[in-house]
Amino acid sequence: MILVSTTSAVPGALSSPSSPSNSSQEELLDDRDPLLVRAELALLSTIFVAVALSNGLVLGALIRRGRRGRWAPMHVFISHLCLADLAVALFQVLPQLAWDATDRFHGPDALCRAVKYLQMVGMYASSYMILAMTLDRHRAICRPMLAYRHGGGARWNRPVLVAWAFSLLLSLPQLFIFAQRDVGNGSGVFDCWARFAEPWGLRAYVTWIALMVFVAPALGIAACQVLIFREIHASLVPGPSERAGRRRRGHRTGSPSEGAHVSAAMAKTVRMTLVIVIVYVLCWAPFFLVQLWAAWDPEAPLERPPFVLLMLLASLNSCTNPWIYASFSSSVSSELRSLLCCAQRHTTHSLGPQDESCATASSSLMKDTPS
């Protein structure tokens, strides 16, 4: 049996994959580096506030807009992405923060298993909701009639349900891997640890999670974005046969204003594609690289401060998700500005140009098309 100590949702963090012996029992019970503990608490607190505040603001803006009419399909996906990221904040970052503050997991075995399960649900849901959103955007652009026939303005649709269902199902192994276990041979100190029946179990499981949470969604997102860009390019830029037909009919192949419009649309698509893929990879890569390093290398520097802090960055992508999609959706960004403006007005209780700008922002939303 392999007993693995962890303060991460993924087994292998902050420990070596070996059972503690009597000689290492005192080492397990020693106090941690106080400076490192403060750094961990500060990092987790910052991430929690950033995730909760950013996703709460964007979700509030979407709910505020939804009260005035039917939600656009993209708004449905952004709202569920915000819910998934809020689940990361509440069920992953917050328990992790309490756990780091107390050093050991204090709670019954059922709570240990539930926390580990919900931590993984948040990781899967955040990644799969982005993938579902990208797949739906690909269908809407490349297969518009199919997208129209299936709708998409409902608060729950098929891709959203599939993303949540896969997140709940793929997280089930956490319930059987983790439990409250003695950290040493009869030490009397218990922690929420993972146990694998075979020596290769830890490496296989961490690799599986890296593939399913990071690698596979990243490849799917990148592939869909490339196909979307190709479809937009093909629809906006006429091909050789179409240009020849226009010349035979005496039509110009394009005007300067048309070319500028095409260039602007393509530039926005390229920017969005690059931002989505690059930010996704940059946010997830450090966490999974150190997780795989810890699982596969017995000599990994598990106690080094950079290594320990990188183990806590599983929720980094949840800080950036709402701002990426809000910035590329004119309706969401306008609603968010209106919400912040009105909140500032109610806070200051002042009347003047600020109220006028708030009212102007609110009224302009009625003419904004969902994007």
Curated annotation (Swiss-Prot):
<feature type="topological domain" description="Cytoplasmic">
    <location>
        <begin position="221"/>
        <end position="271"/>
    </location>
</feature>
<feature type="glycosylation site" description="N-linked (GlcNAc...) asparagine">
    <location>
        <position position="185"/>
    </location>
</feature>
<comment type="similarity">
    <text>Belongs to the G-protein coupled receptor 1 family. Vasopressin/oxytocin receptor subfamily.</text>
</comment>
<feature type="transmembrane region" description="Helical; Name=1">
    <location>
        <begin position="39"/>
        <end position="63"/>
    </location>
</feature>
<keyword id="KW-0807">Transducer</keyword>
<feature type="compositionally biased region" description="Low complexity">
    <location>
        <begin position="15"/>
        <end position="24"/>
    </location>
</feature>
<keyword id="KW-0472">Membrane</keyword>
<feature type="transmembrane region" description="Helical; Name=2">
    <location>
        <begin position="78"/>
        <end position="98"/>
    </location>
</feature>
<feature type="topological domain" description="Extracellular">
    <location>
        <begin position="1"/>
        <end position="38"/>
    </location>
</feature>
<dbReference type="InterPro" id="IPR017452">
    <property type="entry name" value="GPCR_Rhodpsn_7TM"/>
</dbReference>
<dbReference type="GO" id="GO:0035811">
    <property type="term" value="P:negative regulation of urine volume"/>
</dbReference>
<dbReference type="GO" id="GO:0008284">
    <property type="term" value="P:positive regulation of cell population proliferation"/>
</dbReference>
<feature type="topological domain" description="Cytoplasmic">
    <location>
        <begin position="329"/>
        <end position="371"/>
    </location>
</feature>
<dbReference type="GO" id="GO:0034097">
    <property type="term" value="P:response to cytokine"/>
</dbReference>
<dbReference type="InterPro" id="IPR000161">
    <property type="entry name" value="Vprsn_rcpt_V2"/>
</dbReference>
<keyword id="KW-0675">Receptor</keyword>
<dbReference type="GO" id="GO:0010628">
    <property type="term" value="P:positive regulation of gene expression"/>
</dbReference>
<keyword id="KW-0564">Palmitate</keyword>
<dbReference type="GO" id="GO:0048471">
    <property type="term" value="C:perinuclear region of cytoplasm"/>
</dbReference>
<dbReference type="GO" id="GO:0005000">
    <property type="term" value="F:vasopressin receptor activity"/>
</dbReference>
<keyword id="KW-0812">Transmembrane</keyword>
<feature type="topological domain" description="Cytoplasmic">
    <location>
        <begin position="64"/>
        <end position="77"/>
    </location>
</feature>
<dbReference type="GO" id="GO:0038023">
    <property type="term" value="F:signaling receptor activity"/>
</dbReference>
<feature type="transmembrane region" description="Helical; Name=5">
    <location>
        <begin position="201"/>
        <end position="220"/>
    </location>
</feature>
<dbReference type="GO" id="GO:0021537">
    <property type="term" value="P:telencephalon development"/>
</dbReference>
<feature type="topological domain" description="Extracellular">
    <location>
        <begin position="99"/>
        <end position="113"/>
    </location>
</feature>
<dbReference type="InterPro" id="IPR000276">
    <property type="entry name" value="GPCR_Rhodpsn"/>
</dbReference>
<dbReference type="Pfam" id="PF00001">
    <property type="entry name" value="7tm_1"/>
</dbReference>
<feature type="lipid moiety-binding region" description="S-palmitoyl cysteine">
    <location>
        <position position="341"/>
    </location>
</feature>
<feature type="region of interest" description="Disordered">
    <location>
        <begin position="349"/>
        <end position="371"/>
    </location>
</feature>
<keyword id="KW-0297">G-protein coupled receptor</keyword>
<keyword id="KW-0325">Glycoprotein</keyword>
<feature type="compositionally biased region" description="Polar residues">
    <location>
        <begin position="357"/>
        <end position="371"/>
    </location>
</feature>
<feature type="lipid moiety-binding region" description="S-palmitoyl cysteine">
    <location>
        <position position="342"/>
    </location>
</feature>
<dbReference type="GO" id="GO:0005768">
    <property type="term" value="C:endosome"/>
</dbReference>
<feature type="region of interest" description="Disordered">
    <location>
        <begin position="1"/>
        <end position="27"/>
    </location>
</feature>
<keyword id="KW-0449">Lipoprotein</keyword>
<feature type="region of interest" description="Disordered">
    <location>
        <begin position="240"/>
        <end position="259"/>
    </location>
</feature>
<dbReference type="GO" id="GO:0030139">
    <property type="term" value="C:endocytic vesicle"/>
</dbReference>
<feature type="topological domain" description="Cytoplasmic">
    <location>
        <begin position="136"/>
        <end position="159"/>
    </location>
</feature>
<dbReference type="GO" id="GO:1902533">
    <property type="term" value="P:positive regulation of intracellular signal transduction"/>
</dbReference>
<keyword id="KW-1133">Transmembrane helix</keyword>
